[in-house]
Amino acid sequence: MPLLELAAREEPEAPRCAHYLGREYMYQGDWNKAEEELLRHLALPRSTWEAERAASMRYLARCCLETGRRKEALRWFYRAVAEAPSLREGYVECAWYFSQEENWPGVLLMSQSALAITQRDKTYINEDFAWGSVPWDLSALAFWHLGQK
């Protein structure tokens, strides 16, 4: 972590450093620092790679969930989907969020949208949960709860 912090200080305009540092703060459960750094990442002029921006938005949503700001989390999930609509991860995390709210039409919409994406992007941003059983499981739960067994 000290090296990431140093890199972010030495290159404050480098979006990758800001993204990585924010992500690491999130992994360590330092929600406030994570949020601050991820917001900084999104505000940087050179922060233009949609996949990385969408990941920062998903991480911001996770920070919001961990600090009890569910509605704000949903806004970040929506923004992540809008930023990178060709990536499954935003849809799957949004579907998971809706499952926690028992919003079964929302779960179905987001999980089916994720499953409609069949080409896995070849970047490090991919997360296994989006390409394994999770979107299928969420979709099945939604169908069951909606009486479409």
Residue ranges: model-predicted function:
Residues 1-36:
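Catalytic-site signature of metal-activated, phosphate-bearing donor transferases
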Residues 25, 64, 98, 142-143:
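Residue at a conserved register position within TPR or TPR-like alpha-solenoid repeats
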